[in-house]
Amino acid sequence: MRAVFMGTPEIAAEVLKSVLNSKHEVIAVVTQPDKPKGRGHEMAFPPVKEVALEAGIPVLQPQRARDEAFVEELKVLNPDIILVAAYGKLLPKVILDMPKFGCINVHASLLPKYRGASPIQWAVLNGDEKSGVTIMHMAETMDTGDIIMTEEVVLAKDETAGSLHDKLAEIGGPLLISAMDALETGRAPRIRQNEEEATHVKMLDKTMGDLDFSKPAVQLERWIRGLNPWPTAYTKLNGKMLKLWKAEVVPAEELGKTSKNFEPGAIIAVAKDSFDILTGNGVLRMKELQLEGKRKMTTEEFLRGFSLEAGTILGR
């Protein structure tokens, strides 16, 4: 099939690579406009654009998917199918109806669960045991179209949003190609989504990383994993930003009675390779962190150069 591929971030770039290595032809790539990045605010290409340019494929970067000039360009290209993976913009009906085989989307959750943005992070934040990828026909409303096929993955106990992203990126491309092959031969199913089971998730923002230590330790540990690598869980230590990269929940049998003398957010014990933080329910043991102006390091490395005392209150 002659395909137009629409996508923007790293997970979409991995899917694009799979399609480029298949029997199908990518005739053009559509991605979001270049954006300033880093401290120097230099313009950076979206990951999908980098892959497309390396493969010698034309790249389109419209400000809006409904721009008339862009829609006309798609009509001239006349693709058999439009493939969408984390493009970041809703497509108008005129585009959805354009290709012979329609527009199909690669979504990083087991629909109808987690429609919308950030499904990968929310699977970890909510402590899900499994996640997966859904290939679906696109509709005018977000993530509501009929399902073609899905593939599940099991979340590890120490799964981060970053590691789950990589798992789903690995299976997303091959699953999309299987769906394309099934569509081409007329064997692709159309499974309606159960609206009663549908859930929606919102986009993440940096403020979500500010940990509230009155929450249970189990929830905070998930939060640290679910916001890794972005936007990252954090707190304050003596007025400086302290990013929290890895933690463990201290087993109940290890807890002493000293915690009764402290408030949530207090450091209640300091060891050679870790320190313990009291929460609203349970204790969190820090294993990897990053103080403002420093690199990411293990807590053991951090404690070699920083004197930390029990009773210190985080968040101030």
Feature map (PLM): residue ranges:
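N-terminal Rossmann-like dinucleotide-binding module
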Residues: 1-39
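Short beta->alpha connector loops
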Residues: 9-11, 63-66, 87-89
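Donor/substrate-binding cores of folate-linked one-carbon enzymes
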Residues: 21-22, 32, 81-200
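Conserved beta-strand segments of alpha/beta enzyme cores
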Residues: 25, 56-58, 102
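N-terminal glycine-/serine-/threonine-rich beta1-alpha1-beta2 phosphate-ribose binding loop
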Residues: 32, 36-78
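Internal anion-binding site segments
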Residues: 195-316
